[in-house]
């Protein structure tokens, strides 16, 4: 069951955005008929991406925006549509694709942490007292993260919104990324909330703006930044995506991240639709996460049908009414009325598969902590298999897709 779009945590509808070049206003000095394109170079090309990108943009009359050398070899450039078509025929070029917009899928121990049995695992030591931290690094590719939040352990940040990452820049002016980060790794102290992997080191990669929107080129730059640090980072969370779009460059970036041993976790989307047309949730290498409605933090379905944070009703321990579904979804996790950290040092309760995905990303962080960090594709995919095999089926799948995915379960101290 698997599907991409930033999933707006506030349950916005389908993120079906046309895959058309962004307007010329995206770059100063661009011609009126220019758009932004992502160019993927062939891996066997011997010339350095920087020099080849400069030469090609000059040859085809474009304006170079950013160069990528880690997640994939390529660059982003301002080009006319005619130049982009000619560039596709260059023997050193694998793909040329128009940039497109994407969006977010919109201390107490939160119900989601309780529902996946986090407090039952002594290795996680969730007690609100001694601030034991999980030795793992997770990249949150999102709206940024509140790096001064007292409940978060943010160790690095970069702003990639322009297609070029600027280190030590960018904060969360939306709230979505900070919420995701808290579910992954809020510190187990005596304030606020606690995450699945308490105290996990968060690498904040800002690719989305204050409205929760961004571009494929920003995501490409962000993933390139992460893969360059694959020796340190164990997990990527992508609570974002788009419906009906795709990107060869970003697909390659995800594959190369996996090949480097990084586990990539993606939200399924909030359109109550099949994930087969949602990118990157339909990518073969990612862990795609649907959302469960849990009203009481307990198994058994006895929590009623009234949602604490919404006007809708959704029966306890069932598929969330908004969640995408399908054969590309591997696992489900709590996503409705999740309480977590927020921008400006605050806390907030929101819903979406964006909130389900970081539960799984946090669990992946626990599985890869310390000396268990994978360094190969096989290692990253083994983590995905463990996440799935340790899940339980003590919930009701009423999505109608006929395939019941396991519910994340981290209670087993011999595995987590």
Task: Please report, for each region that a protein language model flagged, where it lies by residue.
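Solvent-exposed loop/turn segments at secondary-structure junctions
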Residues: 43-46, 72, 83-84, 100-104, ...
């Amino acid at each position: 069951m698997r599907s991409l779009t930033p999933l707006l945590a506030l349950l916005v509808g389908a993120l079906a955005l046309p895959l058309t070049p962004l307007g010329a206003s995206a770059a100063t000095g661009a011609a009126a008929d220019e758009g932004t394109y992502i160019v993927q170079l062939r891996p066997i090309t011997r010339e350095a991406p920087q020099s080849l990108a400069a030469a090609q943009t000059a040859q085809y009359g474009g304006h170079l925006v950013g160069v990528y050398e880690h997640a994939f070899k390529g660059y982003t450039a301002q080009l006319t549509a005619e130049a982009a078509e000619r560039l596709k025929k260059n023997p050193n070029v694998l793909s040329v694709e128009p940039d497109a917009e994407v969006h977010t899928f919109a201390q107490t121990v939160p119900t989601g942490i309780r529902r996946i049995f986090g407090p039952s695992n002594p290795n996680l030591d969730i007690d609100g007292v001694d601030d034991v931290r999980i030795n793992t690094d997770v990249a949150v590719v999102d709206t940024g993260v509140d790096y001064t939040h007292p409940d978060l352990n943010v160790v690095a940040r970069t702003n990639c919104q322009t297609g070029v990452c600027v280190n030590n820049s960018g904060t969360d002016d939306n709230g979505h990324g900070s919420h995701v980060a808290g579910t992954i790794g809020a510190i187990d102290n005596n304030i606020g909330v606690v995450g699945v992997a308490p105290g996990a080191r968060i690498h904040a990669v800002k690719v989305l703006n204050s409205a929760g929107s961004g571009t494929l080129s920003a995501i490409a730059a962000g993933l390139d930044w992460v893969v360059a640090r694959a020796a340190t980072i164990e997990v990527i969370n992508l609570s974002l995506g788009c419906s009906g779009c795709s990107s060869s460059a970003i697909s390659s970036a995800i594959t190369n991240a996996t090949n480097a041993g990084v586990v990539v976790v993606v939200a399924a989307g909030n359109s109550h639709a099949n994930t087969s047309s949602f990118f990157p949730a339909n990518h073969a290498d990612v862990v795609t996460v649907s959302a469960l409605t849990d009203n009481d933090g307990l198994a058994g379905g006895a929590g009623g049908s009234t949602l604490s944070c919404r006007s809708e009703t959704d029966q306890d321990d069932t598929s969330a009414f908004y969640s995408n579904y399908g054969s590309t979804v591997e696992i489900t996790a709590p996503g409705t009325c999740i309480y977590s950290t927020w921008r400006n040092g605050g806390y907030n309760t929101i819903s979406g598969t964006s909130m389900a995905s970081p539960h799984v990303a946090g669990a992946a962080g626990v599985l890869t902590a310390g000396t268990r960090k994978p360094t190969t594709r096989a290692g990253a995919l083994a983590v995905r298999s463990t996440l799935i095999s340790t899940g339980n089926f003590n919930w009701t799948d009423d999505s109608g897709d006929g395939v019941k995915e396991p519910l994340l379960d981290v209670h087993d101290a011999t595995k987590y």
